[in-house]
Amino acid sequence: MNKLNGRYVFGVVALAVAAILIVTGLAVAEPPVKIVQPPNEAEFNGGFSPKVLSKTKPTPVVFSISGKFRRIDGSHPPALKEFLLEGDKHAGISVKGIPICSQRELESRTTEQARKICGPALIGTGKTEVGIKFPEQEPEIPVNSELLAFNGGFKGGLTTLFIHAYITVPTPAAIVTTVKVKKIHKGRYGLLSIASIPKIAGGSGSVKSFSLKLNKGIISATCPDGHLDARGTAVFAEGTKMSGGVVRPCTGKG
């Protein structure tokens, strides 16, 4: 094979692989939405795969979500108190048949211990960065942790998830965020998730970024009109809020 033919074949293969990635939803280069609300700035992002979904029958998907928070001037950001996610009315959540883990089982546990104790209830993973800054201290201390999402059960129309993180500064501590998910009727949105973040380091810790991916089948969706929408709202301890929406294309079939 000469060089020209070799380049041609390589180019065709590369295009074919790219097309497969796009069609199957494995490409994750979707742009985030950026919100600037002085003195704060935030980015929200999210997506799902596969992108080809039934128009009428819920299709299991892998769901991902992420966020970043900062002060425009680079100083210590405010502490995140809640994160609300309004999901598309064509999406739903189900934890049926998955073992349950309680908040009590996760408290005071390291990441390894949480995974060992509640492994069968693990439904997602991710990572987070926290900045800790005490009034008398300079500079801010960056702390990174894995995120583990566990099934907390379904009762009375509410699905509960527990998201576990473990920090070692200033003292070792487990941070367990409770997420409550319920159905709503709000135009395009039909699912509301409210994540309540506990105080970190006595209120001196702030979430700077997070990313989380839920296992395939926790979220299912249909694609009747070519897109799925979501809207995130960050609520900070200082009383401010920041909101932004994303629209992700999908291909309906059947």
PLM regions and their residue ranges:
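Ser/Thr/Pro/Gly-rich, low-complexity intrinsically disordered stalk/linker tracts of secreted
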Residues: 28-254
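Bacterial N-terminal signal peptides
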Residues: 12-23
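Initiator methionine at the very start of the polypeptide chain
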Residues: 1-2, 29
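Intrinsically disordered, low-complexity repeat segments enriched in small/polar residues
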Residues: 5-8, 23, 27
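Bacterial N-terminal signal peptides that target proteins for export
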Residues: 2-14
